[in-house]
Amino acid sequence: MSTLLNSVLSMASPESSPRKAVGFVSHIPSGFLHFSSVSKGVARVLASTQITLSPKDSAFTITGSSWKPDLDSGSFSDDPRSDEPNLSDSFSHLESLVTGGHKPNVAHSTQLLYDLCKANRLKKAIRVIELMVSSGIIPDASAYTYLVNQLCKRGNVGYAMQLVEKMEDHGYPSNTVTYNALVRGLCMLGSLNQSLQFVERLMQKGLAPNAFTYSFLLEAAYKERGTDEAVKLLDEIIVKGGEPNLVSYNVLLTGFCKEGRTDDAMALFRELPAKGFKANVVSYNILLRCLCCDGRWEEANSLLAEMDGGDRAPSVVTYNILINSLAFHGRTEQALQVLKEMSKGNHQFRVTATSYNPVIARLCKEGKVDLVVKCLDEMIYRRCKPNEGTYNAIGSLCEHNSKVQEAFYIIQSLSNKQKCCTHDFYKSVITSLCRKGNTFAAFQLLYEMTRCGFDPDAHTYSALIRGLCLEGMFTGAMEVLSIMEESENCKPTVDNFNAMILGLCKIRRTDLAMEVFEMMVEKKRMPNETTYAILVEGIAHEDELELAKEVLDELRLRKVIGQNAVDRIVMQFNLD
């Protein structure tokens, strides 16, 4: 373990600037990859598919249009969809009923649709709607809209539009709420022009956009073209008879603040009454965050004085803005005073770790260990449970070379005070640090933990590998795998290799991921469905969509990847 820690600490030290991948990664010229090397790797992948997967093997889910894998779980094999067999049985039963000419139960079918959406099995959810319609059942409007919304949230706007068109062809008109989901989906994809054209078509159909429609368009406008263009768009909407609400103006306030145009935001804020709107707590919070960030404390105080009740009474968000800003500017005493005021007076908000973490982070950055301990003791006394942000704040003590042991003692003390299982608590801390890209602190604390008897398991090593990959230190991640291989107690598992493969696929180095895959097979680690799903998604992520489809079809025929995973990948990358 000490060999591992020493070898990786030297690479992960924040003093070695700039951070970049070295070793086998750095020897490959930029842009070297591509179709040929991936194609060669594909042959090796297909050659490995000699064993049929058991139904228990889980598929790794990559959701969102920007291809963001879910790294929140501790292990790639953890599958939140523990009831998938029941869903499959229920779906098969529904299909049998309808094909047999029977009408299914509306409530049961609707619940199945919701459950499939929650399990990210959207293609089957669409099929449920189709089966209901073909059997003469009118789908519940809220369930139908929910499915459209889920498709759009995951970037599958094309599928959502096709579904809406099919439903309309069958005589099921959509309402503004459903269309708003489509507008929002298009806006999320950065397609403002397409969104505007879509809204025009809706108006020609006789559907009137509402204030939420305008808010989605305005947000897309300031993100794509700047806030001035968003203001022009709002003016056009009003000229055409549109009636925006306060949410629309709050969007513009946010746009000005994100562009650092605090004075313009304040000017618009003061114009709200003349436009027929009374600012609410959201409006005030937007301005307050901007003023505090700029250190304009007198103006912030004046704004706070106006928040005297009703819709503009301070919220827990208001207090957290103040605490975060004060701590950021080094005013920790004032931040702590605001913390105390949160639970006094008429409001008495419940304090959480989110409120304490900025103060702890600042104190750790300044190396004030005694005050950190005092603050954490106060948290525990107030039954405020530390979270991932707390651990990362404490991890920043490791930036002071002389404070590493103090950081460990604080972590150790937190474990004892919360009466946690030490092994599980340490594992959680390391995972939290790695997830946020604080791998250097993770290794330093891990070294102290092992000196006190902590024995890292495969889960912990996967967290380290993912953390190193997240920070671009692939040689370090490979070193972890190599040292695990030499260890007698903790050989690398399939999950460890999957973590490495995923890290390479995320930076469009699927060729190198194929090499790690080959190493995995050579070392007798049998790939699972997760492994193959990551590789196919990696190929698709490099825009080699035809190759990805061919590989996916072949893997499905060889029964090493299940239909649920196939449906998910096909929808994600439009491989139909």
From Swiss-Prot:
Q: Residue range of the transit peptide?
A: 1-37
* PPR repeats by residue range: 105-139, 140-174, 175-209, 210-244, 245-279, 280-314, 315-349, 352-386, 387-417, 422-456, 457-487, 493-527, 528-562
Chief site of localization:
plastid
The family assignment reads: Belongs to the PPR family. P subfamily.
Which Gene Ontology MF annotations are present?
A: mRNA binding
Task: Give a Gene Ontology cellular component term annotated to this protein.
Answer: chloroplast
Query: Which InterPro entries does the UniProt entry name for this protein?
Result: Pentatricopeptide_rpt (IPR002885), PPR-containing_protein (IPR050667), TPR-like_helical_dom_sf (IPR011990)
Q: What species was this sequence derived from?
A: Arabidopsis thaliana (Mouse-ear cress)
Top-level taxonomic group: Eukaryota
The name on file for this protein is: Pentatricopeptide repeat-containing protein At1g79080, chloroplastic
